[in-house]
Curated annotation (Swiss-Prot):
Coiled coil: none annotated. GO terms for cellular component: cytoplasm. It comes from the Eukaryota. This is Protein C10. Keywords: Cytoplasm. One of its GO terms (biological process) is post-embryonic development. Belongs to the UPF0456 family. It is found in: Cytoplasm. The lineage of its organism: Eukaryota, Metazoa, Chordata, Craniata, Vertebrata. The keyword Ribosomal protein does not apply.
Length: 122
């Protein structure tokens, strides 16, 4: 018989703001910033490598923060937290702004070629 799933932590909007703020701050801790930078450099802006190298480091950093709020210390906890944040994004502009900031810490900036740098026409 399968056991009942663990109770998902519930956070109020205010609590979600606090946790999200702590997660963002965790990426600024020198040790974590160095880990992320090393993973990004190893990935060489290749999206496949970003998923293999950067995402696991980012997940670990988030797990270190959110486990104190009842989320499990596995990838599932980060996914549940992300769903909770997504739900509150539409209700709270501060959470929406922090969510954008967190995503910018996780995803590489999209580099687009300069306009006019295509194939020369002659």
């Amino acid at each position: 018989m399968a056991s009942a799933p663990a109770q998902q932590p519930t956070l109020t909007v205010e609590q979600a703001r606090v946790v999200l703020s702590e997660v963002i701050q965790a990426f600024s801790v020198p040790e974590n910033a160095a880990r992320m930078e090393e993973a990004r450099e190893s990935a060489c802006n290749d999206m496949g490598k970003m998923l293999q190298l950067v995402l696991p480091v980012a997940t670990q950093i988030q797990q270190e923060v959110i486990k104190a709020y009842g989320f499990n210390n596995e990838g599932e906890g980060v996914l549940k937290f992300a769903r909770l944040v997504k739900m509150y994004e539409t209700q709270d502009p501060e959470i929406a702004a922090m969510s954008v900031k967190l995503k910018s810490l996780l995803l590489p900036p999209l580099s687009t070629p300069p306009i006019g740098s295509g194939i020369p026409t002659s």
